[in-house]
Amino acid sequence: LKYTDDTYQAMDKEKQNRGYFVSFCIEQYKKKPLRTGGIARDWSFGYTPLLSRFAQNISVRVSGGAMATKLAAHEEALGQMLKIFGSGGRQNITLVGADGAGKSTVVSAFAEMLIDGHQGVPRSLLYQQVFMLDASSLISVAAGRGELENLVTMILNEAFLSKNVILCLDNAQLFFEEGVGSVDLSNVLLPILEAGNLRMILTMDDQRFLQISQMKPQLAHALNTIAIQPSTEA
């Protein structure tokens, strides 16, 4: 099933911009024949067409120490992440901090530890790959709430079935409130976070997180939060 880069490049700009490609992906995904014999071989080998189209594979970028991402100031946060994901509890982490505090840096450092098999990484996390989705980008390509809900649901399903993906939702606050440039998808995301079976990292602005927590205490209760403080290192 090919509906990623080749299909996208073949479409004219008008169709790309108005979300036609998202609708096309959804329809083709639904038509994909169901294979028997357990999890399809595609999935067991990490077949992730939607993630490949809409997300960045952070692990590929940082593998082999390609990026100097780890800062001493973030070692405690990284240790907490390993502990949470290595335990049997809810498999989600929310990195909370101000803009520029280093949330994305922490995600990159964590991805590097896993993909390069650093000492201290639990066996269950070794070589897991971190894919980052930007909430604002997803909102911009979907034609409406229904299409966005379908797209996010299928991406979550794809990540879960791949068995080797940790999904990072950057600027996640945009998915938990209504407003300009944001859409409340709590009805989609909250059950996933509460179940805790899909490993997810959320990054959220600290002030927006506080506001959302007050409005949605059930959501706040479902999240394992880690505060990220700005680094003073040069």
Where in this protein do the model-derived segments appear?
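Histone-fold recognition with a strong bias for associated Lys/Arg-rich disordered tails
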Residues: 1-139, 147-155, 159-162, 166-174, ...
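Conserved helix-to-beta-strand junction in the class I
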Residues: 192
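Alpha-helix N-cap/helix-start and coil->helix boundary motif
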Residues: 206-207, 233
